[in-house]
Amino acid sequence: MGSTYVIDRDKDASTLIHELTHQLMSSQAKQASWFCEGSAEYMGMTPYAGGRFNFGANRSHIVSRVTEYGKKNTGGRALGDDFEAPGLEAYMNMPYSQFTGENANLNYGLAALMAYYFYHMDGKGDARRKNYMKAIQSGTSEKEAQKLLLDGRSYEELAKEIEQKWRKAGVKIRFRSSS
């Protein structure tokens, strides 16, 4: 067995990176469809070159892959820059079989935007996301761990914040009302 590898720069490695992200996740992190798939989509859409991920430039790549067909038409979700999404509470608690069902394209694209939001846009730092991830890894239920992301906000308030932050970045998400 060899000890070297070569990456063909002419090929898109996003699916491989997506699947490797799943392999590196704890089984507990996989209980939340949106988080599991969002994190994998986030990594798969982040530029990778020379053995490094470029997180500083990934927002434009993620937006392009979610709203269009990706930079250089390398593949994307093509949701457009204005789309309706499920109610946030329902989405964050969606069973995996439903997540990957008839609206899978929307669910995966939204998951990438949600991951980016919690990694870069939420609050003044990453405490909410870190606390959520620690809770999940320690065996806390998804519903309980979500309280750490909500941090006193209702799902409707969080949905509005996500909509506002993404609108400033050129993507208009419209979460359905949960009632």
Where in the sequence are the language-model features?
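Acidic/His/Gly-enriched intrinsically disordered linker/tail segments
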Residues: K30-S179
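Juxtacatalytic substrate-recognition/specificity segment
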Residues: M1-A32, C36, A49, E142-A145
